[in-house]
Amino acid sequence: MSGKELNKIVAAILFASLIAMMVGFVANILYKPTLELQHRGYSVAVQESSENQNTTASEQAPVNIPELMKTANADNGREIAKKCLVCHSLDKDGPNKLGPHLWDVAGRPKASIADYKYSPALSKLGGVWDDDSLFAFLHKPSSYAPGTKMSFAGISKPQDIADVILFLKTYVHDK
């Protein structure tokens, strides 16, 4: 290929690029958008449902645990506690899984299973697992013991928590 042919090819490429650029400028002049966006993307307006508002209100309102325990249902608690079995065992002297076994947990000193390594957040709590502490922990473990390694989000309905506590208290006597 001679130098003249190479020059013709380069000139054709430059000319085509120039034409494409000119067409773009003309199109921008003719079809200039008049709308200037404040932000990118698409926003969806969502109204909070009354269910969400009630949940927030119930989380803030004090809960009468003794009254809830009077109406608690251990059979319902057994069903709700099935999600606990992913990480915990309910058997007497059962194996520790991701969490310690829950046999006889109601009334037991906190962080007291010798062969389980508790998080420092739970180890420093002290005391026993009574109705109040079980209720607070099952409602939102991360709030009751900040830094706990228990990743469970918690049980939102107070009556469900009372049912689980009653199940944990009566389970010891069923076996």
From Swiss-Prot:
A GO molecular-function annotation: metal ion binding
Post-translational modification: Binds 1 heme c group covalently per subunit.
Protein name per its UniProtKB record: Cytochrome c homolog
Positions that bind heme c: C84, C87, H88, M150
Upper lineage: Bacteria, Pseudomonadati, Pseudomonadota, Alphaproteobacteria, Rickettsiales
Membrane protein topology class: Single-pass type II membrane protein
Cytoplasmic side, ranges: 1-8
Family under the similarity heading: Belongs to the cytochrome c family.
InterPro entries assigned to the protein according to its UniProt record, in alphabetical order: Cyt_c-like_dom, Cyt_c-like_dom_sf, Cyt_c_1A/1B
